[in-house]
Amino acid sequence: TSAEVPATAQGVTHALEGTQ
């Protein structure tokens, strides 16, 4: 769904931030 796309993108961004 449309709501699933932004949710996944936010999750990836948060994961990348945690890695850095």
Swiss-Prot record:
Purpose: Mitochondrial membrane ATP synthase (F(1)F(0) ATP synthase or Complex V) produces ATP from ADP in the presence of a proton gradient across the membrane which is generated by electron transport complexes of the respiratory chain. F-type ATPases consist of two structural domains, F(1) - containing the extramembraneous catalytic core, and F(0) - containing the membrane proton channel, linked together by a central stalk and a peripheral stalk. During catalysis, ATP turnover in the catalytic domain of F(1) is coupled via a rotary mechanism of the central stalk subunits to proton translocation.
Keyword match Repeat: no
Q: Where in the cell is it found?
A: Mitochondrion; Mitochondrion inner membrane
Regions crossing the membrane: none
Q: Whom does it interact with, and what assembly results? A: F-type ATPases have 2 components, CF(1) - the catalytic core - and CF(0) - the membrane proton channel. CF(1) has five subunits: alpha(3), beta(3), gamma(1), delta(1), epsilon(1). CF(0) has three main subunits: a, b and c.
GO BP annotation list: ATP biosynthetic process; proton transmembrane transport
CC terms in the record's Gene Ontology section: mitochondrial inner membrane; proton-transporting ATP synthase complex
Q: Which domain of life is it from?
A: Eukaryota
The similarity annotation says: Belongs to the ATPase epsilon chain family.
Q: What is this protein called?
A: ATP synthase subunit delta', mitochondrial
Record's keyword annotation contains Transferase: no
The segment annotated Disordered runs over 1-20
Keyword annotations for this protein?
Answer: ATP synthesis, CF(1), Hydrogen ion transport, Ion transport, Membrane, Mitochondrion, Mitochondrion inner membrane, Transport
